[in-house]
């Protein structure tokens, strides 16, 4: 595997981004006086910040790698995880669940279930969410760091893991949900700039949308469905029935309406209108994500074979397999997850590589901070405080809840 060699300009861009997140977290600390400020941003979040935060917190760095790889192998249907798998469910959540949750004044979804049913339901649901969030946090950190740092850059991922964990942990510890959302706004901009840069250069290199479609069509029947949104029901990876009903109707609605990490932002909205509008804005912004993460994978079908044919040394021979197509024998990557790293190495100039890596780190750090904030809110509200009351103790006051929330985040 050949590694991406970052220029000093790239390191400067990444460093400025990291320092910026640190400064924002430090700045928001002065607005945190009680538990409501820490856990729900004082219920003062505007709709645009909520929308930005929902999108970037739901997109991980592995989405850029995984979805592009699936698009390379299966086609544009891989984009349905953000189209049919998010947008309709977010509209549904905005008008049905979000107003109801916001008016109830709860801090968490488990707290709402506790009011609706009983303390047992609240504790069980909270316990499940804590375990899921902590496991996903560890997996997110290690998997992404290993994929991006060891595989792409060739560095020891532990340094990156600790750097991102400390910076993200600091601003989440200091500013709570306010810091999470405000850094998310910056992170979404960084992520979009990096992702759209890769998309623009990818389309430029293959001659535009028309040339891309013609080039893929010329490769023959095995690539005939690469521009089909819904694949046949007998497709092994993305059958239309599974995408429409399993993903779009069942999983997406449950995820967008019942996931604390998603709904958390809307609970901190300054008005019910902001809560609904934030979710709707998030759905609109999410419609652009597949353009950044799936289309570069499609472009790679044309770009990489041409580059490898011109100079076989640009990609190690062990990464390449030769496939017979209607357009002739084409050198293709054996592993679909190597598509984006290879495109970044071969296509992006210094500066844009730094922006792209900053965008990938932004996607990861937003997911981490959102998970930390939501997990600490659930732990203090639904597990510690609820158990304390059930055992005959007094509920936590505002200062105690704030201290326990920060303590759990640090832990």
Q: For the regions a protein language model found, what residue spans apply to each?
A:
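Membrane-embedded translocation segments of transport machinery
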Residues: 333-365, 386-405
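Loop-to-helix junctions at membrane interfaces in multi-pass transport proteins
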Residues: 2-7, 40-45, 49, 66-81, ...
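Helix-loop-helix module between adjacent transmembrane segments
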Residues: 21, 56, 77-175, 247-255, ...
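Juxtamembrane interface elements at the cytosolic ends of transmembrane helices
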Residues: 19-35, 96-110, 170, 174-176, ...
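Residue-level recognition of pore/gate-forming positions within transmembrane alpha-helices
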Residues: 18-21, 57-58, 86-90, 130, ...
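Membrane-interface "cap" regions at the ends of multi-pass membrane proteins
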Residues: 1-64, 172-175
